[in-house]
Amino acid sequence: MKKQLLIAAVAATMGTAAIADVSITGNMKVNYTNTDANGATTDSVSHETNLAIVGKSGDTTVHMEMAMDDASDRFDNAEQTTVVLEDVHLTTTIGAVKVKTGTWNGSDTILAKDSDRTSGNWILSTDMQGVSIALEGDTQASATSTTFSGDIAGVAAKYKMKSTSDELYLSADVAGVAVTYAGISADAANSDAAAFTLSKEFNGVTVSYSDVDADSSYTVTGDTAAFGDAAALAMAAGDDASAIKLSTSMAGNTVSARFVSVDAAAANSDFDVNTFTVTRPLAGGTTLEVTYTDTDKTGSTNDKEVLDVELAVKF
């Protein structure tokens, strides 16, 4: 009997050791959306579920992310009840070189969305005298880029060289004001763009101002807190935009208001988008977020009001 107990204890210990470096996290959100477009009202309920599994062995990490969303967010209705494998990548070190390879989507900037997930990606990076150097490749898109980043006299700088364009990102604190700049210089004619954001807190209220300027052939598609999802705003080539955002905490709630004004390149196509959001953690472990968005376009037949109520949980 003692021998059996000893064997069971050893087996349990070995099993625990085998899975000690594996973690599972996830989140789910459910959204109720009411849309009023020129008097035509629609209601919908959608959900999004994500599950991430991370395994570690020494300096090597494997990340696998799965999702199951409803059909309203997918092109393929069959995915409504199918778990879809999304990000899968491995990170490790070989000497002084950090290696990341696999499938993932990039990071959005104020100018461009990089949410398309591609496979066969790889990044080789290392540090050299305070400067981070990264060589990145995308097998699916047949593209490579080189990025240099570091700190220059208190200014965080990143310069990215792509096959058909160069990108520059700067951020610094100037007299208590957070300043960021993003610029794209493209080989194609009339395809440059630049944006900046100024942000400062006044008596518990964070105030930010953002401005983006695009050449006649560049379409802003960024997705950041400054403007929200520019693609959802349906900005066209050559459209410029500015935004003011206010954010504060009030009675346990996070409250924000964002006012976006789009100066369209086409005549009589300007529009404003005003968004108000209240977020509150609930006792049951969920977070409730209510967002009201009012879009006022040139011409009374182009206006739209959207009320979105989201219930989300992370685990």
What is the predicted role of each segment?
Residues 1-315:
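Outer-membrane beta-barrel proteins
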